[in-house]
């Protein structure tokens, strides 16, 4: 198959692993810088151009779109979709998962466990907002934050009010969430491919750090999931419409709580922690689905 990977940096671990694994399985793998693509949106003949040339119609697309380029990246992915390329994660699903508020509203509607969460725009709602999620301590998150950036733990109601007022003062959109103390600064990353959890790791925050992101000095070990944790991860991926994603869970006294569904999960941490060939599993999914009827190809439904 001819497969295109959208990535800003071909030297990143995940991009390199996908290219190596794809070529080892006999596929043609092209890595294209998302922001250097441009589109010809012509009636009946949509194309993507790159470095002065028209790109071919690929069999499949693996989008590695960073949060900072979500708008343009999903536009490029959507252009490939209307050309008839099978996208492992449809552009609309990526957009859905990147909007933290929208994704939580969708998960909430389907009864997925989540930390109690509040959202507001006016300062006069702050006291009740904090009270409504259970009171301090609370976690305050920027809607646009990634890798633990823009996430603050407020230990007291007064501190929480000050932080929320400061964010509102700069017109930032924020979520206010209950703090799951029993999680102990750890979360679980479930890697879901094709409706199955294929690997899972427990990420522990560095000493004195409540955020468990590996980018912030956290560590990771393989973990065994409970049945309900596995089902929660699979259902969250399905609700987002993602075939390949990372679902982050917290273990709480009332069951697993979904923190985020990541449409472009990194492979280095989970391959290292579990010893599993995740990149190979991505291609197994593509090969199986590309053998199905052409009606399965994504066409960009909005």
UniProtKB/Swiss-Prot annotation:
GO cellular component, one term: cytoplasm
Annotated SUPFAM superfamilies: Glutathione synthetase ATP-binding domain-like
Binding site for Mg(2+) 2: 260, 262
Cofactor note: Binds 2 magnesium or manganese ions per subunit.
Coiled-coil parts of chain: none
Cofactors, names only: Mg(2+); Mn(2+)
GO molecular function: ATP binding; metal ion binding; ribosomal S6-glutamic acid ligase activity
Protein EC: 6.3.2.-
PROSITE patterns: ATP_GRASP
Residues that, per the record, bind Mn(2+) 2: 260, 262
Sequence positions that bind Mn(2+) 1: 248, 260
InterPro entries: ATP-grasp, ATP-grasp_RimK-type, ATP_grasp_subdomain_1, RimK, Rimk_N, Rp_bS6_RimK/Lys_biosynth_LsyX
All copies of domain ATP-grasp, residue ranges: 104-287
Binding-site list for ATP: 141, 178-179, 187, 211-213
Binding site for Mg(2+) 1: 248, 260
Keywords: ATP-binding, Ligase, Magnesium, Manganese, Metal-binding, Nucleotide-binding, Protein biosynthesis
Enzyme class: ligase
Keyword Transmembrane in record: no
GO biological process: protein modification process; SOS response; translation
Family: Belongs to the RimK family.
Protein name in UniProt: Probable alpha-L-glutamate ligase
